[in-house]
Amino acid sequence: MKFAGIIAEYDPFHNGHAWQLAQAKALGAQHVAVAMSCGLTQRGALPLLPEAVRVQAALQCGADLIFALPAPCACAGAEAFARAGVRILAAAGCDALVFGAETPDAALLMEAARVLNSEAYRTELKRQLAAGARSFAAARQAAVEALCPGTALAALLDKPNNNLAVEYCKAILEQEAPMTPVPLPRVGAGHGQALAESGHAQFASASALRALWAEQGADALTPYVPEKALELYKKAEIDGMYTDYAAAGRCELALLRAACARPEAFAAVRGVSEGLDHRLENAVRSCTGLPQLLDALTTVRYPRARMRRLAMDAALGYTADTVPALPPYLHLLGARREALPMLKNTALPVSHSLAKLEKENADCARMAAAQAAASDFGALCRRVPGPMGGVYRQKIIFLTN
C-alpha cells in the first residue's frame, strides 16, 4: 500500500478520523487521498461546516489530497455512495481503500460482497421481499442466511459500518478497481452513538458532535477533535460559517412547496417508485415543518434516512436524467503540494476549478450544475448566509510542510 484512499464526510472531522489517517500511514501509505462529501451528506442533509473548513482540518491532520464526492453522490444510499467514492479514488490511482468496520476482516467482507453481487442473491432477495420481509435490511440478511446458512455473513450485515464496508468491497469488485480493501476496527463511539454511550473520553461520533455543537457551541468539542481542527471550528462559529438547521429545514420545505405548483412535480425524482411521488406531494401540501414531513413519509417499508434523501433530491430537482450515476471528474478541493505529482495519470479529468471541469463533457456539466445547486442552497442556510456561486469561486487549499 503506497497510495491509500478514504471515503469520508468529516462532518465534522474528529479524533477518530485523525486516528484513521495515522493508521493508514502507519500501515505503509506514503500518501492518503480522501473522497469527501461535498455540499450534502449521506443522511440527506447539509454538512455542519462548509468544505473549506473540513478540507483544511483534514489536511492539517494528515490527509494529502482531498477530492469532492459530488453532492448527488454523497446524498445517496450506501451502495451508490460507495460506488461513487471508489470510482473517484480508483481514478486518482489509489492502490488501497482504508475504512472502518465493526468486523475488520477483509477476507470475510469480500466474501460477503461476492455473495451480494451474485445472481443467486438477487433472486433470493426478491423472494424474501415478496414473502413480506419487514424491511429491505431484514430481507437482505435473510437472503444471505438462506444462501450461506451457518456462516457469519448474515450477522455481518447487522452492523452499520460493516454494511458500508461490504458496499465498498462490492464496488471494488464491480469496477474491477485495483484497490486492496484495508478495514480498520472502529475506535470509541459507534455510528450515531451519543456521547454518554460511547464510554470513551477521547472519541465521539460525528452525529454526537453535531448535537453537542448545537447545544453548547464549538468549544464543547474540545476533548473530541484535534486541536488544529478546533481552532478552525471556533473561527467558523464566530464567522457564522456553520449550518443553521432550522433555517435549512424551512428552506427545503419552501423549495418542495414551490415544486408542487408543477404537474407531476416529483415523478422524475431519483428513487421515486410505487407512488412515492404522490405520497411526497401530499405530505408537502399538509406539513408545516421538515420533521413533520419526514414523520409522515417514514414507514417500516420506507426508512427515515431514505425519505430524508428523497426529500432533498426533490427539493434540489435531482432526477435520474439530470444527474450522472457516477462522478465524471475529479474535483480537487485541497492538497499538500508534495502530493500533487500523484495526479499525473488520473483516469478522469482533474482540476480544482469546477468551471473548467463542467466544460469537459455533458456528464461533467450536469454533475457540476447539481453540485452548484446544493452549494448555493447550503450557503443560504448558514448562520450568516452567503451569496450564490461560491462553489465556482472557491480556491484550492494548499498545505506546505
Regions found by a protein language model. Give the residues of each.
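Short hydrophobic/aromatic-rich motifs at helix boundaries and adjacent loops
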Residues: 26-29, 56-60, 138-141, 180
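A glycine-rich helix N-cap at a beta->alpha junction
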Residues: 55-70
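N-terminal catalytic cores of NTP/NDP-binding nucleotidyl/phosphoryl-transfer enzymes
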Residues: 1-54
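Generic structural signal for well-ordered secondary structure
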Residues: 47-51, 59, 78, 82
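Active-site cores that bind ATP or allylic diphosphates and position pyrophosphate for catalysis
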Residues: 68-401
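Short, contiguous strand/loop micro-motifs
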Residues: 7-8, 41-42, 58, 72-73, ...
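Non-catalytic positions within long, well-ordered alpha-helices that form the structural scaffold/packing
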Residues: 25, 59, 86-90
